[in-house]
Every structure is written in C-alpha cells, then in structure tokens.
Amino acid sequence: MTYAIVETGGKQYRVQEGDTLRVEKLTAGEGETVVFDKVLAISRDGKVTVGTPYIEGAKVTAKVAAHGKGPKIIVFKYRNKTNYRRKTGHRQPFTAITIESIEG
C-alpha cells in the first residue's frame, strides 16, 4: 500500500492513488491536472521516507474533479442593551481532486 502526505492550502492530507478529496480552492479548471510538489512523506511497501521538510523530486499528480462551496456557517455578532446585531453567512470554496499517481 503506497500513500503520501502532501501539503496544500496550509493543510496536510494523507493520499493514495484513486482517492478523491476536497482541498482549499485551486486556480486550475475542471479536468486539468495539478501537481503537488510539497510532499512531506511517502510510504512504499512499509518503508517510510520522511522529508526535511519536503522530499526532493517527489510529486503527486491529481486531476481536478469539480469546484464547489462547502456548507453554510452563520456568524452572529451581538452586543446586549444596544440593539446591535449582525448576522452574516459564509461558504468556504473548495476543489475536489482525484489522485492519479505518486512519484518519488
């Protein structure tokens, strides 16, 4: 079982070939290929290689499946006795990707 730990959008993800996951929004369009070169670790056949902080020459390629927005969260500010109320919503944009290959 081969897996890698990649960094994108300020977060780290454990990925395997064929995985589909949601990452922070990427600029690539749907159907395009994205290459992640910030690979922190790779495990092949039980042997783990850890970078310092990244593994040189390692890369993970993925295909952009879709773009979208996450669930809505409500932000409500309130101050008592002053009739101050502010209600806003936020939906975080994401990109769904499918991992194609792990090299390195």
From Swiss-Prot:
Organism whose genome encodes this protein: Symbiobacterium thermophilum (strain DSM 24528 / JCM 14929 / IAM 14863 / T)
GO CC annotations on file: cytoplasm; ribonucleoprotein complex; ribosome
Molecular functions (GO terms): rRNA binding; structural constituent of ribosome
Gene name of this polypeptide: rplU
InterPro entries tied to this protein: bL21-like, bL21-like_sf, Ribosomal_bL21, Ribosomal_bL21_CS
Family matches, as NCBIfam families: L21 (TIGR00061)
Quaternary state and interactors: Part of the 50S ribosomal subunit. Contacts protein L20.
Gene Ontology terms: biological process: translation
The keyword RNA-binding is assigned to this record: yes
PANTHER family: 50S RIBOSOMAL PROTEIN L21, LARGE RIBOSOMAL SUBUNIT PROTEIN BL21M
Entry keyword set: Ribonucleoprotein, Ribosomal protein, RNA-binding, rRNA-binding
Family named by the database record: Belongs to the bacterial ribosomal protein bL21 family.
Entry keyword annotation includes rRNA-binding: yes
Function, in words: This protein binds to 23S rRNA in the presence of protein L20.
Highest taxon above the source species: Bacteria
Protein name (record): Large ribosomal subunit protein bL21
Cysteine pairings via disulfide bonds: none
